[in-house]
Amino acid sequence: MKGTAMNGILPLYKPTGMTSADAVYHARKILGIKKIGHSGTLDPNVDGVLPLAIGAGTKAVPQLMASGKVYTGEITLGFATTTEDLDGEVVDKTPLTQPFTADQLDAALTAWTGNITQIPPMFSAVKVNGRRLYEYARAGETVKRPERQATVSQFTRTDEPVFSATDGTQRFRFEVHVSKGTYIRTLAVDVGKTLGVAAVMSQLTRVKSGGFTLKQAVSIEQLKAHAAAGTLADVIQPIDIAFADLPQVDLTVEQFEAISHGRFLSLDQQTPRVRLHFAGVLKAIYRREDDQYRPDLMFLANEKNV
């Protein structure tokens, strides 16, 4: 399969210590294809699911990015850093003399559940006046950061909190379900603010993204093994998995000929968008407009990966 046309989605496992760009580089080298993009950056100190779009699958990146994400991680109370995680320098300490109760911690998480407003951390890739925030931060500059809206559909504690009287800290693990663009580091800091203490995100793993779970993710080593064995089709998922929530329409030969020329279709459907299949393969996404379906995304060259 290497060196041939490949189209699809690869749920890759990115380990800590690797950038998302590095992960794409390794995938390009292993697969022998340049047209690969990812659907949401993972910081180097975060591991987890990084869906990669391959070939024509890159057209599905916006759809993948729009899907919700699930993380598990750890929050530590008692100090804050420049980066809101353990990579930064400590800038504030509020040593705990006694632990918060489980109920107090749970209430703080509940306070940040629902539709929330966030201010992106200075060490982030958000652009302000043409420069990324981390560029300002590295230069020792501060700048007004735009507020962002996010949705946290679930934010729960998943273990018993651990208190250290020696360090004056308390840590606990959590699971959070969020919309795209949500900063988990900032959520950790905000939880601390609700409790009246400094806080950091001390560990994070993305366990679901683009509809793919951690169990489905393939490591770089596993990807190499599949490439060597000629079994890449076992791990590269078809493009239409990104559009699984859309109704599927199986085209006739005449209908496929019509969409091959960009023509509109009259279909017995009412949904805003549909996915069009021919010979068992996704060929297009059409959108409804004026009682007809018109081209939205085209995948005419898409074939089954073998």
Swiss-Prot record:
> Which Pfam family would be a valid example here?
TruB_C_2
Cite the active-site annotation.
D43 (nucleophile)
Q: Source organism's superkingdom?
A: Bacteria
Its recorded reaction(s) are: uridine(55) in tRNA = pseudouridine(55) in tRNA
Q: Which keywords does UniProt give here?
A: Isomerase, tRNA processing
Q: What Enzyme Commission number(s) apply to this enzyme? A: 5.4.99.25
Q: Name one GO molecular function term.
A: RNA binding
Q: Is tRNA processing set as a keyword in this record? A: yes
Q: Which family does it belong to?
A: Belongs to the pseudouridine synthase TruB family. Type 1 subfamily.
- HAMAP family the UniProt entry points to: TruB_bact (MF_01080)
* Function text: Responsible for synthesis of pseudouridine from uracil-55 in the psi GC loop of transfer RNAs.
Its protein name is tRNA pseudouridine synthase B
Species the sequence originates in = Lacticaseibacillus casei (strain BL23) (Lactobacillus casei)
